[in-house]
Amino acid sequence: PADELFGRRHTDSVASRSTEMVVHGISMGAATTMMVSGEVEHGQYQQPFIKCFVEDCGYTSVWDEFRGELKAQFNLPAFPLLHTANWLCRQEYGWDFLEASALEQVKKCTLPMLFIHGDADTFVPTWMVYPLYEAKPEPKELWIVPGATHAMSYKDYPQEYTEHVKKFVGKYIH
């Protein structure tokens, strides 16, 4: 995406050899964080200053998220609507919903990742964090936030959230 490329160029221009960076995203930002986490070439990240990732309530894939929302919001099955929309996306834009898979990207991630998800999230259902966590090679940590709905973990538990993130990040940023 253009914003990711801009971010890379901008970061490259301000980063020095001593720069240490955490990529942290919530909701769509979490999905983007996980997508970026798998962008490696020859086993190396293009940005060596990235030290770890924190994702908060990201989805497994666009397909899974759309399928879940069709069911939850409209009580509709994936077929034929999602299949048709996927076909149209492939025709018009050259990619499909199955390609936008954070699950596939985290499998390639070699850097540490903290997974955060509210146990009351129904927009990006809590179940999605478990296959993501299982797919990600070590090092990794998981924090399920009791009672938190979608993207509300920090708002509901600001002190605990900050402590979890600082403790995790502190292992990798010096």
Regions found by a protein language model. Give the residues of each.
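Alpha/beta-hydrolase active-site loop
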Residues: P1-V14
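Catalytic active-site module of serine/aspartate enzymes centered on a nucleophile-bearing elbow/loop
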Residues: D156-H174
